[in-house]
Every structure is written in structure tokens, then in C-alpha cells.
Amino acid sequence: MRPAILRERDVPIPLPDGVVLRADVYRDPAAGPRPVLLQYTAYDKANWASVYGVINPERAVDHGFVVVVADARGRFRSGGDEPFRPFAGSGEDAAACVGWAAAQPWSSGQVGMYGASNNGVPQWQALRRRPPALRTIVPHFTASEYDSGWVWRGGAFQLGFNLWWSLANLAPDQLRRATARDGAAAHQDTARALAGALRDPDAAFGRLPLTDAPALDGIAPHYREWLAHPPGDPYWHALSARDALSATDLPVLHVAGWYNVHLDGNLAAYEAIKAAGGPAAERQRLIIGPWTQWSPALFGDACGPERRFPAAIDMEGLQLAWFAQHLSGAGGPELPPVRVFVMGVDEWRDEREWPLARARATPWYLHSGGAANSRHGDGRLSRTPPEGPQPPDTFRYDPRDPVPTRGGATYLPNPAANSGPMDQSAIEDRDDVLVYSSDPLTGPVEVIGPVHAVLHLVTSAPATDVTAKLVDVHPDGRAFLLCDGIRRVTAAEVAAAGSGPVRVEVDLIATGNVFLPGHRIRLEVSSSSFPKYDRHAGTEDGTATAPEDLRPARQTVVHDDRHPSALVLPLVPAEDPAEEPAP
């Protein structure tokens, strides 16, 4: 008979500075002390998705755990007068919550943490402080450093995610708290602007300068702080947990998604711990599924609006088994070091390491007769390098008419309908998108691992952006996005090249896909993906204060024998098969 489950609401957790957090505790009142699973959330402990989206507390109680879901400082039911700032201070508070949970009479003193997206941040921040009772963490879809792994990408600002997440996920509760504290009149302009931005997010994305975000005035100071601190700034180093990774002794179950906006941050944390060879290096596990940032069936069949993967996996059961092993000393089968979902053949694969040792970084070279514009042009991808001169390809980048974002690793309005593997055919009809495609494949081509493009660019602008996408073209012409990247080319790089091309390496992060016979491998090259990334203004520093500051640029991609531009793919040889597919 299933035990009765007690849910204690708004249990106080006092912090050392006197602030009181509020938590909901799920437990079996008839049981003795048990290990605790802690989620420290910025997303409301009363919200169904926040509570049940990663682990069902009732199932966890059935498996012998106590579950504590605590609202973060400055969020929802918890105390704290200052506006919530993502990353800042979450480590001290999360570590205090770990200590509190370990000291309760219903606790065995062993604590594990879990949670996705921003709820993964306090896990890494707690790891920096290593409270004695913390035994393991299971961060989903998150990062341990926040400039390159969260806010910026390739030097560009991740406008779509940063602004929409701030507007939709953070600002409403921040406005509620500020209004309760100061009165409605004090924040009426912000309230009006927020309602307008949520109603018409495209207008919010298009505002210039980027700091012009009236919907966040007085309630979300982090947004302008982020814009004021470019990647590599000491501001980010102070927030990062990266330095703690090499010395950690904690086992970590890393959960990532091919179409998740934080995939690069997920992989960077895993790789950093493994590369350091420290006490926890062999106790890391990595799972990568075909998931987006927000999937309606996150661990069931993963689906975008246009393509579906039969990716059902009992991720909840895997997590509970992991926690039983590391908090209770339970036996049972070990997870493989790496488990990845391979798209195309649509199967789970167990691997020994990440990146795969047997994968070979293989260039596919760009060729054309000088007219690779759009999917109707003459751009080709080939394993054969260019011989002698080739005419370059040129397009006009206009920041007033940027290439629109369509799917991929995004978090934009209506995320279920605008993320994941979406057809890029309409994008590829544009003349400001260069398209290079292989011949139809005669056999399967397996690609698992990091992806990048090396491009040789001449620009008429003092500085610019280069974007790249890897696409799987089906025999019926549909062109599904696998991964993408951006690289902000600086004025110093352009000046150093003189009249010649700048060598630009664009990091597309990673994918796991088998291109099936009859399919084609495709690379798209352009200079924008808006609103995923902010528009480069064509100015020396890339910024604009008003639309009239936006300057078009003539972009030329060179691909001759002296400047061999290429898409570099991690090919898995067919004669060296992977381990057995996962059950």
C-alpha cells in the first residue's frame, strides 16, 4: 500500500543574514530519517512545471527520499528585499539550505540537489562552497559559467533568451514584489511596459539601444549589468563556478539537450571536470537527449513542431537510481559514462567518453561558381579541397532586415513552437544566406561530437558577425536545423587582415545525427539570426543607439586553394561501431 505523503507548505528556512526562505517539504510522516533531494528554485515552488518537471516528489517519496523545494531569495514566498539577480548569492543560500535540510529530524544527513535551467545554477554555486552534507548534484540544461555559457555566445549577446527569459520568467514576480513594497504608482510605467512587451515581444527585441528595456526598469537590474560586462570581464569570473570544478569530489549527473540553449555550458562543465583528472573525474555521467529548453514532453517523445523523435526515457527513474546510489549506498547497475540520443536513426547510444575518441574531425570544403546565394544557388560541400582559384560568394548583410531565427537551440516566445529541429527552407530562400550542400549521400554518415566551421571572410564593415548552421536535408527538400553558431569579428581582426580575408572559426557546439542515404549535408552562412542574437550594427563596436545607426555591409566568403573554407564534422567511422544501443 502506498504510504501517505505529507506536503508541508511554506516551511521556514532561516539564513545567516536573517532572511527567511520558504520551502515545501514532501515526505512520508511514518518513515524514519531519509536522504533529502533539494531543489532551490527561482520559478515558484507552487508552479506545477517547477515542482514536477524534473522529478515527481511523490515518486521520490515512494523511493525513500524526502523532497524539499525552496523558493530562492527574493522570489515568490521567500524573503529578501533586493531585486533577484541570477547567479549572484545563490551559492551561499543554497549551501545554507543544504545544511538546514541535513539537520532536520526527518533527514539522514545526506543531501542531493537537482533542477533545470536556472535551478541548475545554485547546484554549481553550492558545489563551489561544498557544504559537508552535499553528496551529489544533477544539473539539467544549465551552465557553471555565465558569460560564454549563458549570456554571450561567440561574442554576441543572446538577446532572445536573455530578454524573453527576463520578461516572461523573472519580471512578473519582481513587479509584484516591488509593487507590494512601494505601491502601484511607483512602478506603473514599468507595469505598462511589461504588459506591452509580453503582448508584442518583437517590438521589445527590436528596441535600440539594447539597454532600452523599460519593462525591466527598477525590477530586473541584472539585464543591463549583463550588457555592461562583455565576455571575459572580471564580473563573470566572480560569478563562475569553473575554478571549483577541477578540485571537486562530487559525483555529477549532467543532463543536456541537443536543442537546449545551454548545451555549450553543460558540455563545458562536464569536460572541465573530466579533463582535470581530479577526485571526481571518473564519477561524472553525461546524458544528451534531443531536448529543447522547454519541451512539453521533456523526457517522453521529444518533439518540435515539425519533427518528432521517439526518445522516451525514464529520466526520472535514472535520477532516483543515481540518488539512491550516492545518498543511500544502494547497489544496482551503473550508468554508462555517456549516453547520447542519435538523431536520424533515433536511438540511444551508450559511449565510453565525450567527445567520442573514435570520431574524426573531417573537413567538408566549400565550393561554388560564385553564386551560392540561397538554396537555389550553386554552393556545394565536398570532401575534396579546392584546387586553384575559385570565385568567392558575396551577400549583403542589412541589420534592418536580419535573417530571422527559426527553431534550434532557442528560448523565444511560444518556445514549444519555435525551438528544436525546424525546417529552414524558407530561410534558405533569402539571398543573404549562402547555402552549401553535399551531393545526395549514397550511405549513412554518422556525426557525433563538436562541430565548427572555418570561413575566410572579407567585409566592407569595420567589424561584423558571421553565423553558420548545420542542416540535414531530407529527400523531399525539407531542411532540418541540427546546430548553429555565431562569431563576432572584431575591428582589430578586420584591420589586421588589411584587404585580405579574416580567418573566422565559428563554433556550432555539437550534435549527434546520422545523415541517411539520400539526404544531404548542408551548411548555411550569413551574418545574423535575429532575435536569437543581437544584430551587429555594422559599426566598430557593433552597437547602435537608434535604427539610423544600423549600417549594411558587403560580405564575401573566400574558398580557394589558399583560403580553404570548410565545415568540420566529427565523423564516426562505419567500420568502428559504437557500443551496443542503450536499452
PLM region spans:
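N-terminal cap/lid segment of alpha/beta-hydrolase-fold proteins
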Residues: M1-A30, S437, L441-G443
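Glycine/threonine-rich phosphate-binding loop and adjacent beta-strand/alpha-helix elements that clamp
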Residues: R7-P12, C303-G304, P310-L318, L327-P583
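Cap/lid segment of the alpha/beta-hydrolase catalytic domain
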Residues: P29-A102, W152, A297-R307, E428-R430, ...
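Accessory cap/linker subdomain of secreted extracellular hydrolases
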Residues: G53-V54, D62, R128-A247
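A catalytic-pocket lid/entrance helix-loop region that shapes and gates access to the active site
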Residues: G89, Y114, V121-D189, W258-Y259, ...
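Alpha/beta-hydrolase fold nucleophile elbow
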Residues: P105-N118
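Short beta-strand/loop motif that positions the catalytic acidic residue
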Residues: H254-A256
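Active-site-adjacent alpha-helix of alpha/beta-hydrolase-fold enzymes
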Residues: D264-Q284
